[in-house]
């Protein structure tokens, strides 16, 4: 409709997006585990795969994706970000981490996150302090980083020969 304006809330642009993509990532990891078992490949080979020496391996890509999902929803809602040990060493453990993250993110309701567009968000990245307003944090920092790490995890597994495709990444529509 010409001239119509679409309204998208902070909640709609965050929690359901994280939930959908994390569910897709969990399914991709399940396929990767089956692939490794079928071919008698030690799963640590896939979990430690990286594209370049200075890039994180698959395990860390998944950990960072879950960190962005839980951290973003928590910060937008103004609650503490849960800390995870980052000690996953199997596909099953990574899927457990995703499940724990899904439980956390799914607990938020629209009222918890909506209205956070102007919330002050401060992060520490190495020795730098990053300051954002909620909407800029979500749209220009958190979502791009989340998608980067989910996509990199997908690409690493695809490059290793795991039989996954675009619909595995996108998921059910």
Predicted region positions:
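Residue-level detector of short coil/turn "hinge" positions at structural boundaries
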Residues: 36, 43, 112, 164-166
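C-terminal end-helix/capping segment
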Residues: 158-173
